[in-house]
């Protein structure tokens, strides 16, 4: 006889217990892993009578019961490593945790949200001001200028802008010639060809 399947598609969903784990449940899970090893988490409920689903058993072991999980506060070295990895990987906590020995993705995520994100919120502003890695620049008025000078400098005639754009192409050759001074005949001929190309004489 087939088991009744709930609307969510999980078999025997009502059989599993949710919420905090007890000391007795932890001991059952640890004894099972010691005897059978990790993996096949869905078999634990059948073989041990533990009323927990396979996913719950796996997460409990990986995040709390495994002897490889490091306890205690994060060190400065771990903080620095997490910050560097987060700049590269973003919020990919499982990938970050794999590169932080002894820490789980759950530990790293919680520590980031409760400590590092707030800490970096203060440091980011200081860092951006000190290292110069600013993408957008804000042009502030020169403090030595008077208010009238600032207003005059900010007024731009549309006709002048259009005139500058029209003259740009005609001044291209003069601009290049002002940057280059050659005495060698070959270099002079090469430069002449470049000037002709800019002026539209070469096809």
From Swiss-Prot:
Gene Ontology cellular-component annotations: nucleus
Gene3D superfamilies on file: Homeodomain-like
Subcellular location: Nucleus
GO biological process, one term: positive regulation of DNA-templated transcription
Residue ranges flagged as DNA-binding region: 41-65, 93-116
Induction of the gene: Transcriptional activation correlates with reduced histone acetylation on H3 and H4 mediated by HDA18 in N cells. Repressed by CPC in hair cells (H position).
InterPro entries assigned to the protein according to its UniProt record, in alphabetical order: Homeodomain-like_sf, Myb_dom, Myb_TF_plants, SANT/Myb
Domain HTH myb-type: 13-65, 66-120
Keyword Phosphoprotein in annotation: no
Domain of life: Eukaryota
SMART domains, per the entry: SANT (SM00717)
GO terms of molecular function: DNA binding; DNA-binding transcription factor activity
Keyword annotations from UniProtKB, A to Z: Activator, Developmental protein, DNA-binding, Nucleus, Repeat, Transcription, Transcription regulation
Tissue: Restricted to roots and hypocotyl. Specifically expressed in root non-hair developing cells (atrichoblasts) at the N position. Also present in lateral root cap cells. In hypocotyls, expressed within files of epidermal cells located outside a single cortical cell equivalent to roots N cells (at protein level).
Subunit structure: Interacts with GL3, BHLH2/EGL3/MYC146 and BHLH12/MYC1.
PANTHER family in alphabetical order: TRANSCRIPTION FACTOR MYB8-RELATED-RELATED, TRANSCRIPTION FACTOR WER-LIKE
Miscellaneous note of the record: This protein is called 'Werewolf' because plants lacking WER exhibit hairy roots.
Function (record text): Transcription activator, when associated with BHLH2/EGL3/MYC146 or BHLH12/MYC1. Involved in epidermal cell fate specification in roots and hypocotyl. Together with GL3 or BHLH2, promotes the formation of non-hair developing cells (atrichoblasts) et the N position in root epidermis. Regulates stomata spatial distribution in hypocotyls. Binds to the WER-binding sites (WBS) promoter regions and activates the transcription of target genes such as GL2 and of CPC.
Protein name per Swiss-Prot or TrEMBL: Transcription factor WER
Gene that specifies this protein: WER
């Amino acid at each position: 006889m087939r088991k009744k399947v709930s609307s969510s598609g999980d078999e025997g969903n009502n059989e599993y217990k949710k919420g905090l784990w007890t000391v007795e449940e932890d001991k059952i899970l640890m004894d099972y892993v010691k005897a059978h090893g990790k993996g096949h988490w869905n078999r634990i409920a059948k073989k041990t009578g533990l009323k927990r689903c396979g996913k719950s058993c796996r997460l409990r072991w990986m995040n709390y019961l495994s002897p490889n999980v490091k306890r205690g506060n994060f060190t400065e070295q771990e903080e620095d490593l997490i910050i560097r990895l987060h700049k590269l990987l973003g919020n990919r906590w499982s990938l970050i945790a794999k590169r932080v020995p002894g820490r789980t993705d759950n530990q790293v995520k919680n520590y980031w949200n409760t400590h590092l994100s707030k800490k970096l919120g203060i440091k980011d502003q200081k860092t951006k001001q000190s290292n110069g890695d600013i993408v957008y620049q804000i042009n502030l008025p020169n403090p030595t200028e008077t208010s009238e000078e600032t207003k005059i400098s900010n007024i731009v005639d549309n006709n002048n802008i259009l005139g500058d754009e029209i003259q740009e192409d005609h001044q291209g050759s003069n601009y290049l010639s002002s940057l280059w001074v050659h005495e060698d005949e070959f270099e002079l001929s090469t430069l002449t060809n470049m000037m002709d190309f800019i002026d539209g004489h070469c096809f």
